[in-house]
């Protein structure tokens, strides 16, 4: 039977009816009987978690399908119906085979350098092999490649760029030639000029974005996925390394202290800011609502955060919003989430690929 829903649609704020035919939306009533699944509320495209790691957990790798499914279900329960996996050491493509799980856009494995990232998490190559590995991971992912662009340099005792700028530029150019976009892990300031000059597509974390760097990024189309709820771990990371690497520890504390101001300044400069949790490392999955609250707490207007977490974020990742013929992926809330963050905790209905899943 054809499913029917009525409510106020965002972002256009129009109250109207929609029907689901073949997993897609239509605003023209079809022939035959219909089943109304909701008759009021605020209807928005499913939320996005634009930085998570399906197949990773605080306890370690999750290679089994059941464990990965459980992680994806946590995201779905929070309203995240589109996940961008920002690198995973295990094969998580099984999640893509389940119609009841969020859509998953994969970035293959992280590309890192030996001794310059979390051990065993990424594919480790030297600079001479970076471009070739980008080719491999572009083929292994779904239009995204993930590069670790800075990490602690133990000899220097502080964060430092991982790749020479010319090599990084060649790697990003090769990804673009292959039709892939590049996301870069970067905490500090020093790796950012090379990334920006290379045409990086997505800055992950971005705590090193100074005012001058923000001015350079603005207008380029480069996005930032700040993962604020993971940045909240910086003080504990600093404490763990303080005895051996005091300069690094002080740097991490300073980055944490300015993180909210810097992301707000980036937003005010017009840089797109998208929601991502970094789930799978030190954080569990299903925390997109916490990240939304953190971004609002940083001073970004709530309506803008919801837009970037929903219809604008989906568009950035290549999916349509609530328009004729679009995939029927939406969440219905009792109140307007641009006004009430609390309503995100209790969705009335969740529809994924045209089926009611919650």
Regions found by a protein language model. Name each.
Residues 1, 129-224, 240-241, 253-273:
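Histidine/acidic residue-rich metal-binding segments in metalloenzymes
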Residues 58-62, 192-198, 230-243, 261, ...:
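Histidine/acidic-residue-rich catalytic or RNA/ligand-binding cores of hydrolases
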